[in-house]
Regions:
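Acidic/histidine-enriched segments that form metal/cofactor-coordinating
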Residues: 61, 68-176
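His/Glu-rich zincin catalytic helix
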Residues: 1-67, 91, 104
Length: 176
């Protein structure tokens, strides 16, 4: 990629790519994109990327979910994530002076999640509710029909949330 005067691209020795753009704002936006989405799932794993996205917010080997949320929100930040067909992204808006803390916590969430069965089962129920809500939204369903038509036979035709059937069969200790 070509650098411009405000955006810088770095590749670390471990292959992780970093994009940095300086702005004079006191607020910084940070994100980590993991190259795993619906397109990487086998039919029986459909919904796994989205399930893992939810589960990593339930704590790490070193910090509880409550500690992570309080650490970010306690300094005025917000943290969230989303899953697409191509990737899963974890991101935050934070005062610039707290970027290092935020990146550390996001990295810990991704690299050292603690999948406790009780918590992952709660997330399974949350996602089952999401699926129910999604299935009550005609505009979402027509979009799924379109993707099924265009991407028939491909993992890209699979819904990001998974299905009730596949979600019930995913392990409560997901591996990734």
């Amino acid at each position: 990629m070509q650098e411009n005067s405000q955006t810088f691209y770095h590749i670390l020795s471990n292959g992780i790519k970093i994009v940095h753009r300086w702005t004079p704002s006191p607020v910084a936006y940070v994100g980590v994109m993991v190259g795993a989405g619906t397109r990487d799932e086998k039919p029986e794993e459909n919904g796994m990327a989205h399930y893992i996205e939810h589960c990593v917010f339930k704590g790490t080997a070193h910090h509880s979910a409550r500690h992570i949320i309080h650490a970010i929100e306690g300094v005025g930040g917000e943290i969230n994530a989303y899953t697409t067909k191509e990737e899963t992204t974890f991101y935050a808006a934070i005062l610039a002076e707290h970027v290092q803390l935020t990146l550390h916590l996001i990295a810990e969430m991704i690299l050292e999640p603690c999948f406790k069965k009780e918590e992952t089962e709660k997330e399974r129920m949350v996602i089952l509710d999401e699926i129910e809500s999604y299935n009550d939204t005609p505009s979402e369903l027509i979009y799924d029909d379109f993707e099924n038509l265009v991407f028939a036979g491909s993992s890209l035709a699979q819904p990001i949330l998974g299905t009730r059937k596949t979600l019930r069969h995913l392990s409560s200790k997901p591996e990734y």
